[in-house]
Design a protein with these regions (language model features):
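Residue-level signature of alpha-solenoid helical repeat scaffolds
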Residues: 17-25, 58-62, 78, 96-100, ...
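Short inter-helical turns and helix N-cap capping residues of alpha-solenoid HEAT/ARM repeat scaffolds
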Residues: 11-12, 48-49, 86-88, 125-126, ...
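Short, intrinsically disordered, charge-balanced linker/junction segments flanking boundaries
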Residues: 5, 26-28, 84, 236-241, ...
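HEAT/HEAT-like alpha-solenoid repeats
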Residues: 1-7, 32-45, 70-84, 108-122, ...
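Residue-level signature of the C-terminal ends
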Residues: 25-30, 63-70, 101-108, 139-144, ...
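Alpha-solenoid helical-repeat scaffolds
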Residues: 6-8, 12, 18-26, 43-45, ...
Length: 249
C-alpha cells in the first residue's frame, strides 16, 4: 500500500502508470485499505497527462469486476462517463470496458446506461471510436441478452458508416452474432444496411458481405432472403474482383 501511494504521487508519469496496474492487482487483498486504493485510482483518472488517463481507462473494466457492486455504481460509473466525454484516444480505450460492464450489470436496470453508451459511441464524430464499438460488438451479446435487439439499428448504422474500416469490421462481426437477433429486426435494419453498401468500392467490404449472407438467410428464412437479396447475391457472384467472387464460392 505504501509503495502504491508513493509512486502514484510521483511527479513523473512512469510511477503513476505503474500505480494504475498495481491498484488492480492489490485491490482484492487490500481489506480496509480498499477505500484508499479507490481514491488513488480516482486521482489517476483525473490526471491531466494523457498517458496516465489512458492507462487508468485501460484498467477500468478489470477493476470493476473485482470491486463491490455498490462501489461500481455510482462511483466508478461516474468516471466511466468522464472517460467517454474525454479525448478520442481515451474514449477508444474506455469503450473496451463495456465488455466487463455489460456482464456485471446483466439482468439489472443499470444495463440501460450501457445501451445509451453504445448508441452514443455509434454516433461519435471520431471514426476510431465507432470502429472500436464495431470491433467489440460481438463480445457484448452475452451480457445484453434480449436487450441486444434494441441495438440492432445501431449495428445497422455501423454497417452503413462513412468510413470503410468501420463498415468492414461491423460486417465481419455480423456473421457471428446475427443468430441472436430478432428476425423482424434483421429484415428491417440489417438487410437494408447491407443493400446500401452492396456497391461499395472496397473489395474487402463486398467480401465481408459474402460471409454474412448464409447466416442472414438462416435468420430470415430462404423465402425472404430470395425476395430481398437474391439480386445482390447474383451481382456479387459476377463481381469483377476475384477476391469478392471467391467469397461466394
Amino acid at each position: 500500500m505504501n509503495l502504491i501511494t508513493i509512486i502514484s504521487n510521483q511527479e513523473y508519469f512512469t510511477g503513476k502508470v505503474s500505480a494504475c496496474y498495481l491498484i488492480r492487482m492489490a485491490y482484492e487483498k487490500a481489506g480496509k485499505e480498499r477505500e484508499k486504493l479507490r481514491n488513488l485510482y480516482y486521482k489517476l483518472c483525473d490526471d491531466e497527462t494523457p498517458l496516465i488517463k489512458r492507462t487508468a481507462a485501460k484498467e477500468f473494466g478489470p477493476l470493476c469486476l473485482i470491486m463491490e457492486k455498490e462501489i461500481v455504481n455510482p462511483e466508478m460509473i461516474n468516471y466511466f462517463k468522464k472517460f467517454m466525454s474525454d479525448s478520442d484516444s481515451v474514449k477508444v480505450i474506455a469503450l473496451s470496458s463495456l465488455i466487463q460492464l455489460v456482464k456485471l450489470f446483466q439482468n439489472t436496470d443499470n444495463q440501460r446506461l450501457n445501451v445509451q453508451v453504445v448508441v452514443a459511441a455509434s454516433e461519435d464524430k471520431s471514426w476510431r471510436v465507432r470502429h472500436e464499438l464495431a470491433r467489440i460488438f460481438p463480445q457484448l451479446i452475452d451480457g445484453f441478452g434480449n436487450q441486444i435487439n434494441e441495438l440492432v439499428p445501431t449495428l445497422g448504422n455501423l454497417i452503413k458508416d462513412s468510413e470503410m474500416e468501420v463498415r468492414n469490421v461491423a460486417l465481419e462481426g455480423l456473421a457471428q452474432i446475427i443468430r441472436f437477433f430478432n428476425t423482424e429486426k434483421v429484415s428491417i435494419c440489417i438487410i437494408p444496411a447491407i443493400l446500401s453498401v452492396a456497391n461499395d468500392s472496397t473489395p474487402h467490404v463486398k467480401a465481408s458481405i459474402g460471409e454474412c449472407l448464409g447466416p442472414i438467410a438462416r435468420s430470415v428464412g430462404y423465402s425472404t432472403f430470395n425476395t430481398k437479396m437474391c439480386t445482390l447475391f447474383d451481382s456479387l457472384m459476377k463481381d469483377e474482383n476475384a477476391e469478392v467472387r471467391l467469397g461466394y464460392v
